[in-house]
Amino acid sequence: MLPGCIFLMILLILQVKEKVILGVEGQQLVYPKKLPLMQKRDIGHTHDDDIEETYEEELMYEIKLNRKTLVLHLLRSREFLGSNYSETFYSMKGEAFTRHLQIMDHCFYQGSIVHEYDSAASISTCNGLRGFFRVNDQRYLIEPVKYSDEGEHLVFKYNPRVPYVANYSCTELNFTRKTVPGDTESEGDPKMKAIHNEKYIELFIVADDTVYRRNSHPHNKLRNRIWGMVNFVNMIYKTLNIHVTLVGIEIWTHEDKIELHSNIETTLLRFSSWQERILKTRKDFDHVVLLSGKWIYTHVQGISYPAGMCLPYYSTSIIKDLLPDTNIIANRMAHQLGHNLGMQHDEFPCTCPSGKCVMDSDGSIPALKFSKCSQNQYHQYLKDYKPTCMLNIPFPCNFDDFQFCGNKKLDEGEECDCGPPQECTNPCCDAHTCVLKPGFTCAEGECCESCQIKKAGSICRPAEDECDFPEMCTGHSPACPKDQFRVNGFPCKNSEGYCFMGKCPTRRDQCSELFDDEATESHDICYKMNTKGNKFGYCKNKENRFLPCEEKDVRCGKIYCTGGELSYLLGEDKTYHLKDPQQNATVKCKTIFLYHDSTDIGLVASGTKCGDGMVCNNGECLNMEKVYNSTNCPSQCHENPMDDHGLQCHCEEGQAPVAWEETLNVTNVAILIVVLVLVIVGIGVLILLIRYQKCIKLKQVQSPPIETLGVENKGYFGDEQQMRTEPILPEIHFLNQRTPESLESLPTSFSSPHYITLKPASKDSRGIADPNQSAK
């Protein structure tokens, strides 16, 4: 006992002494030199230009360390503080005061070492350079001697072999979380389906009274300390495409709000209960951390619930905050967060190239990488538990307006963006210009392979169910086409169910998910229990009041199963034993009451068949025509109708839907075009006729009529010679091709020398015989 007390006293003395950092060896005095930017980046603004910012968006510092010159390239962190960030303090009387801050200007940066492929940095420039940087497998801590970014600084070298405070140890509360059945919201969300898509964790941190008193001067010391930790954690989790964002802090000024027990597991249970009952009522977050400065937990430095993320009670952890080095504390925070995301301790052969992994059990020095084992465990966690709370983006709408090459986002004018040149690992993208390298057609996407777009027809998203369809590459885009599936209401599993959002929900499958593969749906008699109106038998819950089912809806309330083992989900099981009068046998009706993301997953899932042409929807058994707005798809497609997330009707390849509305629209457009063409042609003809008439009148004025002797025709009565202005001709050529009948109607004064051709008269069949001559 006495040696232990002496050891603790020595550690306390060491922490009080200035610039003594445990866990490091050696120190070197350096003078960082601020460098001008080699190329000014095109940076968008997310706020008013009138607001003058104290801290620049991009910085470069030169540090001469161990006879080598390092150039530190830093970009101001943009996503480690949420738009709804708040701070809560307590008065002497225990009253809580909360203020909401719009943080537009801060001094926290992330970056890398120029020309060092494997490097990283998490730095604060508030009062000099303070933080962490890594070059290959060597890690450094930098601290200012004076409050200046170009004055004296000390650089410490982390050494995992140097003993400090106590060998790191953590623990997990012993409980098991079973796979959460797929709910329609998370299953239909493309972000949840794509494991590698961005996820977001809204983090809230509570500091106990001891941590507050140790960091109360200057007044913003504790805030900057916590911000530095979160900036470090954010940098670590970016490698998993997770953005860890701080949405608030609470400082237990003057007294702790729970009793901090000597047993850390007991303290975790108390803190979990407090945050769910009190903290959750005034702040939304995904995970909460308690920073405790008490010397009561022996060698254990942290604790959390395994795979507890997004469960209101279990998304909690405790971190022991006893060291002056924030990087060590932040690394422990990242470690416990990993447990909450389903990761376990790394043991051989689970290793990292740089030597240390985030999930190493010793946690002796800061680590930035996750082993392949940890990555696989996290991906399996996403598939098993579907943590939908990680989908909402905690940034303002205009956050993406901040555009520049190197932000790992595809901005306007960019072909690719793999991050800063020192961090880029994409062989297809030029990190300096954010354009594809010569000869390449893509940099990323499900339809991009070896920097080339896959050929058309390559499957990029296989079918997950008989109600789903595989998606294939188009041959001209690196992205996989939008997910499409069979129309809602299409019969599936031998008519046991109907397709719903690409799945075929049945009671049999839901029972096996809730309990185990041996479980199946129980007898129909069980569903009469849904008329009771309690948490084990109801259809709807309004303000914590369980409403009984109407007779027509009993099969859409709680689901009742038989067989299988007891559920290991965090919920309550209930088994009824009912008498079946027809078979004179006892029937087991097993159900469960469990909330997941504010939804009782013990209810019959929406889309489950409850009768012919009937499906469950929010505790009611309804006709599919009332539930689905795409039930007319089978009438539009000959067979195999499809649907998508927008409930739009499609047909499989080779079929064309009878889109009457679209056909009518096309017909109307065609008619309109024809009418317009006819009108234009008519106007043109009218103009030509007017010009033609004017031309005739003009010629009549310029040339007098030509009198032509009539041709002798014995068809006339007598031998009288007639003088006519209208010649009788064997051939007449008019531009407008008049008929003989129209010629007979011409006026006797008509004369047109330009359009009538005169030819010698000849005897032909058109001549009229002289009756006198015939008589002779």
From Swiss-Prot:
> What does UniProt give as the signal peptide span?
1-23
Taxonomy, superkingdom:
Eukaryota
List the cysteine pairs that form cystine. Answer: 310-389, 350-373, 352-357, 460-480
Q: Which residues does the entry place in the Cytoplasmic compartment?
A: 691-776
Tell me which residues make up the Peptidase M12B domain.
Answer: 199-394
What terms describe the molecular function in GO for this protein? Answer: metalloendopeptidase activity
Domain Disintegrin stretches: 402-488
Tell me which parts of the chain lie in the Extracellular compartment. 26-669
Q: Name one GO biological process term.
A: positive regulation of flagellated sperm motility
Q: Which residues are glycosylated?
A: 84, 167, 174, 584, 629, 665
Q: Which InterPro entries match?
A: ADAM_Cys-rich (IPR006586), Disintegrin_CS (IPR018358), Disintegrin_dom (IPR001762), Disintegrin_dom_sf (IPR036436), MetalloPept_cat_dom_sf (IPR024079), Peptidase_M12B (IPR001590), Peptidase_M12B_N (IPR002870), Reprolysin_adamalysin (IPR034027)
Provide the alphabetized UniProt keywords: Disulfide bond, Glycoprotein, Membrane, Signal, Transmembrane, Transmembrane helix
Q: What is its main location?
A: membrane
Location(s), subcellular: Membrane
* Keyword hit for Translocase: no
Q: How does it assemble?
A: Interacts with ITM2B in sperm; the interaction increases following capacitation. Interacts with HSPA5 and CANX.
- Record PANTHER family: ADAM A DISINTEGRIN AND METALLOPROTEASE DOMAIN, DISINTEGRIN AND METALLOPROTEINASE DOMAIN-CONTAINING PROTEIN 7
Please identify the protein, giving its name as recorded: Disintegrin and metalloproteinase domain-containing protein 7
